[in-house]
Swiss-Prot record:
The UniProt record lists the keyword Iron: no
Other facts noted in the record for this chain: P2 protein and myelin basic protein together constitute a major fraction of peripheral nervous system myelin protein.
Residues given in the record as hexadecanoate binding sites: R107, R127, I128, Y129
Entry-linked Pfam families: Lipocalin (PF00061)
GO molecular function, one term: cholesterol binding
SUPFAM superfamilies: Lipocalins
Function: May play a role in lipid transport protein in Schwann cells. May bind cholesterol.
Residues the entry annotates as binding (9Z)-octadecenoate: R107, R127, I128, Y129
The encoding gene: PMP2
Protein location: Cytoplasm
Name of protein: Myelin P2 protein
Length: 132
């Protein structure tokens, strides 16, 4: 994994997030809170363990994993998923599976910013973060 991912990132723009949350099955009240949140994402690495901590006024979440190894995750909207993160062509690609459903979150670096592309049932959401 590129060390360029490591550090603290602040959300600066979000496109189609409400539709993405709807596709995930997130209820209206949680979607409203999610749309208001401007999360900070902290990515760190210790040995071969990567940690992604997301902090917002709505909720804090943290996942720690080894690339290519499945782990259990409880998402910010309380889904219990089996997740796996891989590194492909410089992108951190996360797949979450639960109840026969699947979503992907692809994080890549573009012009010094971290771009997270989230996909579910044909809905694509793009969230852009700047390094703090």
């Amino acid at each position: 994994m590129s060390n360029k991912f490591l550090g603290t990132w602040k959300l600066v723009s979000s496109e189609n997030f409400d539709d993405y949350m709807k596709a995930l099955g997130v209820g209206l009240a949680t979607r409203k809170l999610g749309n208001l949140a401007k999360p900070t994402v902290i990515i760190s690495k210790k040995g071969d363990i990567i940690t992604i901590r997301t902090e917002s006024t709505f909720k804090n979440t943290e996942i720690s994993f080894k690339l290519g190894q499945e782990f259990e995750e409880t998402t910010a909207d309380n889904r219990k998923t089996k997740s796996i993160v891989t590194l492909q062509r410089g992108s951190l690609n996360q797949v979450q599976r639960w109840d026969g459903k699947e979503t992907t979150i692809k994080r890549k670096l573009v012009n010094g910013k971290m771009v997270a592309e989230c996909k579910m049932k044909g809905v694509v959401c793009t969230r852009i973060y700047e390094k703090v």
